[in-house]
Amino acid sequence: MSLFGDTIAYLLSLTEDGEGKAELAEKLHCWFGGKEFDLDSALEWIKNKRCLTDIQKALIGASICFLKPKDQERKRRFITEPLSGMGTTATKKKGLILAERKMRRCVSFHEAFEIAEGHESSALLYCLMVMYLNPGNYSMQVKLGTLCALCEKQASHSQRAHSRAARSSVPGVRREMQMVSAVNTAKTMNGMGKGEDVQKLAEELQSNIGVLRSLGASQKNGEGIAKDVMEVLKQSSMGNSALVKKYL
């Protein structure tokens, strides 16, 4: 895969599946695909995207600034504050040393990625802020390599936390994870599906899950809710049934 393709993949790995992720993917493919775009407008879109966390906004915003450093008229607080606000004084010092001594000598994406892998996330965040504030001191490949290494660490932490919740020893947590998964699936299919029958089905599923939450569901029944919803979606006429069966 190309340098930009790798970057898109790592950035998308940070976000949860859903309609917002599909919209973000379309934007990233446009920005990294070589099409001309206005940097300020792109940054405003990222800043106002509600489905993204502050860290995600900062990383995605920094990545497109690395694409067009000459068009960057001013530094954005929604990028600098999350990057500089994490960690201790010691980790920030490590990040500064990493940026000033090691990354300045790097010349390739993979070299920067391998060096960054050996550092903790808070140090990498501060290192990226230094790169963002001094774009002319580093090549685009080095900046994106450092960013992708951090994305891999962040995605790993997020997926471990999600798996931990899904395997929780508390039945109520597992049940709610199933319900959240079912609601997200219904909302996504409602937004992406074509035809009134698809949208009606998705709305009914959301309504039924809401009723179950209001009335309460037994531990045993609650755990099967998401599976039942998935089965209904698979059996319905929702356009590309092959994709539905593959991902649901």
Curated annotation (Swiss-Prot):
<feature type="region of interest" description="RNP-binding">
    <location>
        <begin position="165"/>
        <end position="248"/>
    </location>
</feature>
<dbReference type="Pfam" id="PF00598">
    <property type="entry name" value="Flu_M1"/>
</dbReference>
<dbReference type="InterPro" id="IPR015799">
    <property type="entry name" value="Flu_matrix_M1_N_sub2"/>
</dbReference>
<dbReference type="GO" id="GO:0046761">
    <property type="term" value="P:viral budding from plasma membrane"/>
</dbReference>
<keyword id="KW-0694">RNA-binding</keyword>
<dbReference type="InterPro" id="IPR001561">
    <property type="entry name" value="Flu_matrix_M1_N"/>
</dbReference>
<keyword id="KW-0946">Virion</keyword>
<dbReference type="GO" id="GO:0039660">
    <property type="term" value="F:structural constituent of virion"/>
</dbReference>
<feature type="short sequence motif" description="Nuclear localization signal">
    <location>
        <begin position="101"/>
        <end position="105"/>
    </location>
</feature>
<dbReference type="InterPro" id="IPR036039">
    <property type="entry name" value="Flu_matrix_M1"/>
</dbReference>
<dbReference type="Pfam" id="PF08289">
    <property type="entry name" value="Flu_M1_C"/>
</dbReference>
<protein>
    <recommendedName>
        <fullName>Matrix protein 1</fullName>
    </recommendedName>
</protein>
<dbReference type="InterPro" id="IPR037533">
    <property type="entry name" value="INFV_M1"/>
</dbReference>
<dbReference type="GO" id="GO:0042025">
    <property type="term" value="C:host cell nucleus"/>
</dbReference>
<keyword id="KW-1048">Host nucleus</keyword>
<keyword id="KW-0472">Membrane</keyword>
<dbReference type="InterPro" id="IPR015423">
    <property type="entry name" value="Flu_matrix_M1_N_sub1"/>
</dbReference>
<dbReference type="GO" id="GO:0003723">
    <property type="term" value="F:RNA binding"/>
</dbReference>
<dbReference type="GO" id="GO:0055036">
    <property type="term" value="C:virion membrane"/>
</dbReference>
<comment type="function">
    <text>Determines the virion's shape: spherical or filamentous. Clinical isolates of influenza are characterized by the presence of significant proportion of filamentous virions, whereas after multiple passage on eggs or cell culture, virions have only spherical morphology. Filamentous virions are thought to be important to infect neighboring cells, and spherical virions more suited to spread through aerosol between hosts organisms.</text>
</comment>
<feature type="region of interest" description="Membrane-binding">
    <location>
        <begin position="1"/>
        <end position="164"/>
    </location>
</feature>
<keyword id="KW-0468">Viral matrix protein</keyword>
<comment type="subunit">
    <text>Homodimer and homomultimer. Interacts with NEP. Binds ribonucleocapsid by both interacting with genomic RNA and NP protein. May interact with HA and NA. Cannot bind NP without genomic RNA.</text>
</comment>
<comment type="function">
    <text>Plays critical roles in virus replication, from virus entry and uncoating to assembly and budding of the virus particle. M1 binding to ribonucleocapsids (RNPs) in nucleus seems to inhibit viral transcription. Interaction of viral NEP with M1-RNP is thought to promote nuclear export of the complex, which is targeted to the virion assembly site at the apical plasma membrane in polarized epithelial cells. Interactions with NA and HA may bring M1, a non-raft-associated protein, into lipid rafts. Forms a continuous shell on the inner side of the lipid bilayer in virion, where it binds the RNP.</text>
</comment>
<dbReference type="GO" id="GO:0016020">
    <property type="term" value="C:membrane"/>
</dbReference>
<dbReference type="InterPro" id="IPR013188">
    <property type="entry name" value="Flu_matrix_M1_C"/>
</dbReference>
<comment type="similarity">
    <text>Belongs to the influenza viruses Matrix protein M1 family.</text>
</comment>
